[in-house]
A protein has these predicted regions:
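Structured interface patches
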Residues: 1-174
Protein backbone atom coordinates (compact mmCIF):
# COMPACT_ATOMS: atom_id res chain seq x y z
CA UNK A 1 0.00 0.00 0.00
CA UNK A 2 1.36 3.41 -0.95
CA UNK A 3 0.55 6.31 1.36
CA UNK A 4 1.71 9.79 2.47
CA UNK A 5 1.46 11.80 -0.72
CA UNK A 6 2.25 8.92 -3.04
CA UNK A 7 5.35 7.52 -1.31
CA UNK A 8 5.70 4.17 0.45
CA UNK A 9 7.09 4.63 3.97
CA UNK A 10 10.76 3.60 4.18
CA UNK A 11 11.27 3.23 0.43
CA UNK A 12 11.79 5.17 -2.76
CA UNK A 13 8.64 3.83 -4.47
CA UNK A 14 6.26 6.54 -5.61
CA UNK A 15 2.68 5.69 -6.55
CA UNK A 16 1.29 6.69 -9.93
CA UNK A 17 -2.35 5.92 -9.13
CA UNK A 18 -3.15 9.64 -8.98
CA UNK A 19 -1.61 10.34 -12.43
CA UNK A 20 -3.78 9.65 -15.51
CA UNK A 21 -1.96 7.78 -18.30
CA UNK A 22 -2.79 10.43 -20.90
CA UNK A 23 0.33 12.16 -22.24
CA UNK A 24 0.67 15.69 -20.90
CA UNK A 25 -0.71 15.04 -17.41
CA UNK A 26 1.61 16.01 -14.59
CA UNK A 27 1.87 15.57 -10.82
CA UNK A 28 4.16 17.63 -8.55
CA UNK A 29 4.80 17.21 -4.84
CA UNK A 30 7.21 17.84 -2.00
CA UNK A 31 8.33 14.51 -0.53
CA UNK A 32 10.72 13.31 2.14
CA UNK A 33 12.76 10.15 1.75
CA UNK A 34 14.98 8.46 4.33
CA UNK A 35 18.59 7.93 3.21
CA UNK A 36 19.38 4.33 2.31
CA UNK A 37 22.00 2.52 4.42
CA UNK A 38 25.63 2.04 3.37
CA UNK A 39 25.78 4.68 0.67
CA UNK A 40 29.40 5.82 0.55
CA UNK A 41 32.28 6.57 -1.79
CA UNK A 42 35.87 6.82 -0.58
CA UNK A 43 35.94 8.95 2.57
CA UNK A 44 32.40 10.37 2.22
CA UNK A 45 29.01 8.83 2.96
CA UNK A 46 25.39 9.85 3.20
CA UNK A 47 24.37 10.23 6.84
CA UNK A 48 22.55 6.97 7.65
CA UNK A 49 18.77 7.28 8.06
CA UNK A 50 18.91 11.06 7.52
CA UNK A 51 15.97 12.88 5.97
CA UNK A 52 16.17 13.70 2.27
CA UNK A 53 13.71 16.46 1.33
CA UNK A 54 12.73 16.27 -2.33
CA UNK A 55 10.65 17.96 -4.98
CA UNK A 56 9.24 15.62 -7.61
CA UNK A 57 7.52 16.19 -10.93
CA UNK A 58 6.11 13.23 -12.83
CA UNK A 59 4.86 13.75 -16.38
CA UNK A 60 2.83 11.21 -18.29
CA UNK A 61 4.31 10.60 -21.75
CA UNK A 62 3.30 8.24 -24.55
CA UNK A 63 5.40 5.23 -23.49
CA UNK A 64 5.61 5.81 -19.73
CA UNK A 65 6.35 8.56 -17.24
CA UNK A 66 9.18 11.08 -17.05
CA UNK A 67 10.35 11.66 -13.48
CA UNK A 68 12.25 14.80 -12.43
CA UNK A 69 13.48 14.65 -8.83
CA UNK A 70 15.47 17.32 -6.99
CA UNK A 71 16.68 16.29 -3.54
CA UNK A 72 19.03 17.24 -0.72
CA UNK A 73 21.08 14.85 1.39
CA UNK A 74 23.39 15.09 4.40
CA UNK A 75 27.03 14.06 3.85
CA UNK A 76 29.45 12.90 6.55
CA UNK A 77 33.12 12.66 5.63
CA UNK A 78 36.71 12.95 6.81
CA UNK A 79 39.00 15.56 5.33
CA UNK A 80 41.45 13.72 3.06
CA UNK A 81 44.32 15.90 4.34
CA UNK A 82 43.78 16.43 8.09
CA UNK A 83 41.27 13.61 8.85
CA UNK A 84 38.92 15.99 10.69
CA UNK A 85 35.19 15.22 10.41
CA UNK A 86 33.35 17.28 7.80
CA UNK A 87 29.58 17.53 7.28
CA UNK A 88 27.56 19.36 4.67
CA UNK A 89 24.28 19.26 2.80
CA UNK A 90 24.50 18.41 -0.89
CA UNK A 91 21.94 18.64 -3.70
CA UNK A 92 21.31 16.34 -6.62
CA UNK A 93 18.89 15.92 -9.50
CA UNK A 94 17.51 12.84 -11.23
CA UNK A 95 15.71 12.77 -14.57
CA UNK A 96 14.58 9.30 -15.55
CA UNK A 97 12.13 7.79 -18.03
CA UNK A 98 10.11 4.85 -16.70
CA UNK A 99 8.45 2.82 -19.45
CA UNK A 100 5.11 1.05 -19.24
CA UNK A 101 5.52 -2.70 -19.67
CA UNK A 102 4.10 -4.04 -22.93
CA UNK A 103 0.81 -5.87 -22.55
CA UNK A 104 -1.29 -8.06 -24.83
CA UNK A 105 -4.97 -7.45 -25.66
CA UNK A 106 -5.97 -8.98 -22.31
CA UNK A 107 -3.68 -6.72 -20.29
CA UNK A 108 -1.08 -9.40 -19.50
CA UNK A 109 2.57 -8.33 -19.50
CA UNK A 110 4.43 -9.46 -22.63
CA UNK A 111 8.06 -10.50 -22.20
CA UNK A 112 10.05 -9.09 -25.11
CA UNK A 113 13.07 -11.11 -26.27
CA UNK A 114 15.29 -8.67 -28.09
CA UNK A 115 18.96 -9.69 -28.04
CA UNK A 116 20.03 -6.23 -29.27
CA UNK A 117 18.69 -4.56 -26.12
CA UNK A 118 20.58 -6.78 -23.64
CA UNK A 119 23.20 -4.06 -23.14
CA UNK A 120 20.61 -1.37 -22.37
CA UNK A 121 18.98 -0.91 -19.00
CA UNK A 122 15.44 0.37 -18.87
CA UNK A 123 13.37 1.32 -15.85
CA UNK A 124 9.76 0.20 -15.83
CA UNK A 125 6.56 1.24 -14.11
CA UNK A 126 5.60 -1.70 -11.88
CA UNK A 127 2.32 -2.08 -9.99
CA UNK A 128 1.40 1.56 -10.78
CA UNK A 129 4.56 2.82 -9.06
CA UNK A 130 8.13 3.83 -9.88
CA UNK A 131 11.07 2.83 -7.72
CA UNK A 132 13.60 5.67 -7.61
CA UNK A 133 16.19 3.96 -5.38
CA UNK A 134 18.63 2.95 -8.15
CA UNK A 135 18.44 6.37 -9.81
CA UNK A 136 18.95 8.19 -6.49
CA UNK A 137 21.91 5.93 -5.57
CA UNK A 138 23.56 6.58 -8.94
CA UNK A 139 23.12 10.35 -8.61
CA UNK A 140 24.53 10.43 -5.07
CA UNK A 141 27.53 8.23 -5.91
CA UNK A 142 28.41 10.57 -8.78
CA UNK A 143 28.09 13.62 -6.50
CA UNK A 144 30.14 12.40 -3.53
CA UNK A 145 33.80 13.49 -3.64
CA UNK A 146 36.48 10.80 -3.52
CA UNK A 147 38.77 13.04 -1.45
CA UNK A 148 36.68 15.53 0.55
CA UNK A 149 38.39 18.53 2.12
CA UNK A 150 37.44 20.60 5.17
CA UNK A 151 38.74 23.66 3.27
CA UNK A 152 40.42 24.00 -0.12
CA UNK A 153 43.58 25.35 1.56
CA UNK A 154 43.80 22.66 4.30
CA UNK A 155 47.47 21.96 5.05
CA UNK A 156 46.82 18.46 6.38
CA UNK A 157 48.94 16.70 9.01
CA UNK A 158 52.67 16.40 9.57
CA UNK A 159 54.04 13.23 7.93
CA UNK A 160 56.50 12.76 10.83
CA UNK A 161 54.39 13.27 13.97
CA UNK A 162 50.79 13.35 12.72
CA UNK A 163 49.96 16.77 14.25
CA UNK A 164 47.80 19.19 12.28
CA UNK A 165 49.84 21.72 10.33
CA UNK A 166 47.24 24.46 10.88
CA UNK A 167 47.94 27.32 13.29
CA UNK A 168 51.21 27.40 15.26
CA UNK A 169 54.57 26.94 13.51
CA UNK A 170 55.56 23.30 13.29
CA UNK A 171 59.18 22.16 13.48
CA UNK A 172 61.07 18.95 14.19
CA UNK A 173 64.59 18.65 15.61
CA UNK A 174 66.95 16.97 13.17
Amino acid sequence: MIVRGGIEPGSFRVSLTHLPRRPGNMWEADLEFVAPPELEVGMAKVAPASKMPAQIRIESVLDGVLVNLDFDFEVEAECARCLEPVMWTDHSRVTELFLYEETDSRGRVVQACDDASEELTFFYVQDDAVDLLDSVRDAIVLDLPLSPLCRPDCLGICPQCGDKLEGAPHEHAT
